[in-house]
Amino acid sequence: MIFSKISQVAHYVPQQLVTNNDLASIMDTSHEWIFSRTGIAERHISRDEMTSDLAIQVADQLLTQSGLKADAIDFIIVATISPDATMPSTAAKVQAAIAATSAFAFDMTAACSGFVFALAMADKLIASGAYQNGMVIGAETLSKLVNWQDRATAVLFGDGAGGVLLEASKDKHVLAETLHTDGARCQSLISGETSLSSPYSIGKKAIATIQMDGRAIFDFAIRDVSKSILTLMAQSDITKDDIDYCLLHQANRRILDKIARKIDVPREKFLENMMRYGNTSAASIPILLSEAVQKGQIRLDGTQKILLSGFGGGLTWGSLIVKI
């Protein structure tokens, strides 16, 4: 049988840093108010780079690190809710920029679960035997979706990208998987609506910026995500002691605290970087993974079991246990 493995990781964030104190100068908030509620102290905001620019930086790094030629890449999946445009896809721009002429490319929209969903799909593509090498990138410029007068949401989000290179392997590395969607709760977190504008349409005001029912999302993350992780471990016969690190979507420090208690995994196994990046949606998990590899916490030698878990708009949530 053919399986997939993560062979390379990379990330990139825009240079411009926006601190909580910077935000306090343009809206009614303070560093203490933001940090005590979220664990976020600063975030990177793009000045002129689009989502594709961030993703291209990651793709270039992955290629360089791997030593592969661009035409050896079979597919590129970009998980994003903030594409440059609805057409062409962000992934198509990445494919062109790195000259991966043999690759097919497409975007995936699953909000903050996007990277996990895309990684699960990429694993199946390689397991089919038809493809050998693929890139999965989470990239966001959420700054263009934020209402900068709304302190409840503007303080949360940042821009950035992270990704992995998947290669075919004779050993199984994706050990367990669970993916979920509950569209009935979709109005809890929305953004980027468009209006009907033909001569035959009745106008409807669209919600362009991010709007969130914070309490509903907080409760969802604690209840549904924790339950699905516990179920996943039970079904796969993987215990909490088997897990080396937990890399969850970086939405809020208090969410991580509560999920750690719910699933009874030591809090120190939960890596975090939201203090420096905020919530970067589909980019948060791969950025966290890339930094952990840089720091030597995760070795990419196939000896560690890592829980990856994303959750967000849709509502969507999903987890993978991978051997890295």
Curated annotation (Swiss-Prot):
Pfam families the UniProt entry points to: ACP_syn_III, ACP_syn_III_C
Chain positions covered by the region annotation ACP-binding: 250-254
Primary localisation category: cytoplasm
Active site residues according to the UniProt entry: C112, H249, N279
Disulfides per UniProt: none
Pathway assigned in UniProt: Lipid metabolism; fatty acid biosynthesis
Alphabetized InterPro entries for the sequence: ACP_syn_III_C, ACP_syn_III_N, FabH, Thiolase-like
Key words of the record: Acyltransferase, Cytoplasm, Fatty acid biosynthesis, Fatty acid metabolism, Lipid biosynthesis, Lipid metabolism, Multifunctional enzyme, Transferase
GO biological process, one term: fatty acid biosynthetic process
GO cellular component assignments: cytoplasm
Enzyme Commission number: 2.3.1.180
Known role: Catalyzes the condensation reaction of fatty acid synthesis by the addition to an acyl acceptor of two carbons from malonyl-ACP. Catalyzes the first condensation reaction which initiates fatty acid synthesis and may therefore play a role in governing the total rate of fatty acid production. Possesses both acetoacetyl-ACP synthase and acetyl transacylase activities. Its substrate specificity determines the biosynthesis of branched-chain and/or straight-chain of fatty acids.
Domain notes: The last Arg residue of the ACP-binding site is essential for the weak association between ACP/AcpP and FabH.
Name of the protein: Beta-ketoacyl-[acyl-carrier-protein] synthase III
Annotated gene: fabH
